[in-house]
């Protein structure tokens, strides 16, 4: 999509780089995250108004530490360095960076002075969040110090002649209360951004671009019933109407009543026509005897492609594939070490187009999840879709430890439905970001009436998170957990023991496989 202005964020590996982009976009300022290896030709484009250098876990004084294209310092573009990014600026302009004796971690209060363009409206004191070991020992010309911490550390600096700034703290996190104001000052006061980015303008532009690209061709979209694929279908459908075919493949690995719910929800939307294919027998046959998690994922991915390809080739005039790729999918598929080293191959990035020889449409690839949700609301999607908990691509197969069978899926479906039902009744479903049940390959002794039982154990999992990069377990009330455990043990055949997972991420992941 074409943009008249943007801020480029160079990623040096910080866990909160995406927060910088989200804060700016919340202000209506479009921005993109690029790996630090990006060349100046890709950064200094006509629409680029400024550059942000993110934080990162490395030390600028270590050999081989990540550095940007040196030409960006001579580009004339405004630059704003955060933590590691500030140290890069200091090092480049001759201000020595040294290891700290103990570093600064957590809340701090800094004193502001100097350059009014970035400090505008922030007063002379600011509460911030520090997280650094190294620091700039002494600011040298042509830089000048514009803020200091109570520990005597350089908290911010600026170039005397150029629009180059750095802060040692993290303005993007909520622990820096006025951080968003600081980022706005840089983007608006220094870079001259006008802030015209909105979801209304995005939808209008996306519809025009989809129509222009597709013409009279037909488009197929793999719809899972989740937020991303459903918004994709609704957006493409708004652009081209009945030229779009949404294909839902029933793998047999979905949640209880999922197929019926998706058919009902999507069939009622004016821009979406749904074609449902029941391929559950095929998936269970391929998964028979398989217990290793990665093998399950590969089998499910391969089988899905085979089914999708079979159905797509049976349709006349289909030339395009619409995918629900969103911006975090794109970011996660490119490492901060550059294109040669991927963090992971995301299921939404690549795969199907090469096999199907279809042209790819990814209308949401510039959007974060919260922006995708806003687009869905503008397109008239119901809250049951907009605020549904995330569900993994391989479905229940990665929530069943061990072999995946139809019987075990039915058992897990029933237990999961009870958990979600009780969360909704108690008003907790919307308070937690994700909740589900895991079926263990473990049996436990129990008592039912006068009979001894020897049946499966399951795990309840509920987490709180802003971005799923880190997560903490939800502190559900004990009486709620007790009701869930009692209902599962009494109503679900094959389960006699219920546990609750209280592990955070890290060290654990949200899903068990």
Question: Can you annotate each of these PLM segments?
Answer:
Residues 1-53, 57-63, 67-68, 73-75, ...:
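RNA-binding accessory domains that recognize and position tRNA/RNA substrates
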Residues 81, 85, 90:
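Gly/Ala-rich beta-loop-alpha elbow adjacent to hydrolase catalytic centers
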Residues 323-325:
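Extended catalytic-interface subdomain
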């Amino acid at each position: 999509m074409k943009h008249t202005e943007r801020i480029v964020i160079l990623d040096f590996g910080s866990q909160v780089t995406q927060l910088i982009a989200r804060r700016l976009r919340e202000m209506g300022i479009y921005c993109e995250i690029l790996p630090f290896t990006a060349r100046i030709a890709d950064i200094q484009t006509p629409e680029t108004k400024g550059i942000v250098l993110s934080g990162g876990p490395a030390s600028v004084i270590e050999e081989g530490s990540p550095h940007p294209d040196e030409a960006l310092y001579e580009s004339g573009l405004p630059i704003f360095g955060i933590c590691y990014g500030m140290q890069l600026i200091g090092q480049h302009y001759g201000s020595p960076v040294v290891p700290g004796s103990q570093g600064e971690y957590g809340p701090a209060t800094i004193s502001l002075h100097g350059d009014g363009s970035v400090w505008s409206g922030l007063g002379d004191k600011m509460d911030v969040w520090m997280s650094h070991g190294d620091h700039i020992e002494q600011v040298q010309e042509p830089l000048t110090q514009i803020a200091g911490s109570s520990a005597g550390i350089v908290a911010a600096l600026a170039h005397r002649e150029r629009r180059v700034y750095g802060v040692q703290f993290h303005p993007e996190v909520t622990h820096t209360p006025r951080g968003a104001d600081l980022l706005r000052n840089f983007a608006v006061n220094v870079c001259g951004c006008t802030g015209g980015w909105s979801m209304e303008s995005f939808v209008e532009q996306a519809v025009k671009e989809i129509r222009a690209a597709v013409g009279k061709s037909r488009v197929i979209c793999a719809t899972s019933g989740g937020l991303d694929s459903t918004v994709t279908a609704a957006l493409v459908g708004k652009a081209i109407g009945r030229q779009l075919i949404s294909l839902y493949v029933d793998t047999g690995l979905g949640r209880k009543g999922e197929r019926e719910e998706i058919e009902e929800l999507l069939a009622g939307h004016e821009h979406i026509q749904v074609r449902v294919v029941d391929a559950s027998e095929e998936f269970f046959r391929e998964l028979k005897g398989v217990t290793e998690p990665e093998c399950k994922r590969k089998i499910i991915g391969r089988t899905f492609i085979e089914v999708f390809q079979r159905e797509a080739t049976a349709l006349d005039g289909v030339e395009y594939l619409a995918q629900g790729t969103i911006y975090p999918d794109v970011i996660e598929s490119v490492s901060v070490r550059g294109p040669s080293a991927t963090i992971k191959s995301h299921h939404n990035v690549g795969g199907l187009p090469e096999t199907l020889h279809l042209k790819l449409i990814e209308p949401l690839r510039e959007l974060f999840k919260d922006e995708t949700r806003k687009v869905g609301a503008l397109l008239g999607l119901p809250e049951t879709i907009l605020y549904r908990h995330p569900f993994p691509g391989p479905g229940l197969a990665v929530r069943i430890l061990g072999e995946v069978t139809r019987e075990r899926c039915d058992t897990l479906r029933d237990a999961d439905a009870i958990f979600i039902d009780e969360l909704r009744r108690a008003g907790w479903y919307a308070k937690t970001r994700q909740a589900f049940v895991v079926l263990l390959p473990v049996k436990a002794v129990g008592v039912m009436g006068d009979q001894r039982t020897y049946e499966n154990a399951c795990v309840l999992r509920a987490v709180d998170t802003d971005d799923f990069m880190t997560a903490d377990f939800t502190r559900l009330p004990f009486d709620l957990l007790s009701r869930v455990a009692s209902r599962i043990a009494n109503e679900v055949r094959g389960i006699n023991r219920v546990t609750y997972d209280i592990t955070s991420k890290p060290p654990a992941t949200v899903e068990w496989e």
